[in-house]
Amino acid sequence: MYGYLRTHAPELKVREQEYYRAVYCGLCRTMGKCTGQCSRMTLSYDFTLFALVRLALTGEDLTVKSRRCVAHPLRKRPMAEPTPALALCAYASAILAHYKVKDDLRDERGLKRTAASVVAPFIASMRRRSVRKGYGDMDSGVYLAMKELCELEASRIPSVDEPATLFGELMGKLLAYGLEGNEAKLAHTVGLRLGRWVYILDAADDYAEDVKYRRYNPLACLYADPSMTELTPHKREELKIALLAELAELECAFDLLDTADRPDLRGILSNILYEGMPRQIERVLFGDGECGCAREGQGRKRHYDRRRRKGDDHG
């Protein structure tokens, strides 16, 4: 996917880093088993977070073993054994990658289009394996959602909120797939907020290039100013506020995940929410400049940790 949903490694504890690496590498191995070895090339931080959230929702236990892999043949690494949560994320990743490549073939030019055309047959094979494994309804849902999103983007609607919500709804349905009741509702909320945040941040990240090559960008349609080839400082501040608001909504959803007996999983999710994602906002909107997102995230994390400790003490 996009690679924005990542940890900030310097702030992870050693055991949290090991847990995260086990899930990341375990997802990679599961993708190879479920959708073919080529699918491992589409491994992303984004679906690693999806896997972590699914583990929190389902309460699945991880079995971690030290293994070698093709990418790291000399040294064994902690690697989670396949679980239903990892398998679901493997299939969802393959299906979404297929429609993302189709989107690139339609919209991109030059080397990006050539690259998409080269990988398209392999990605299509991954998607077919997912359908054969019983995920045809997921495939149909992604197809319809992406079709609706493409039609909305083609209309060049002067809004970032509507396409962001459509993408968020898609992510929510993927994350909630197969769940019921409160778990499904919570998964959908987490996916919705993550999807909206990713869509808005990606639009900001691609703004200058999209304007240069006259590609669709929801922010360019919203601002409707052909002379604005780059986001102005004022627009960047507006986007920062909007993205932090999405993180605040996501915080409320993360707070409902039952991770009381899994401190490593809790610590990783907290790190991504309060350290990793704010730093992605800083990187995309302000480059190396300091905008206060990371400091604000750290402050919210300290408040979150205090609230959690009180809750655990009373539990």
Predicted regions and their residues:
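Conserved, well-structured core segments
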Residues: 294-296
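Acidic catalytic motifs of isoprenoid enzymes
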Residues: 1-169, 173-189, 196, 200-236, ...
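Long, low-complexity, intrinsically disordered segments
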Residues: 300-315
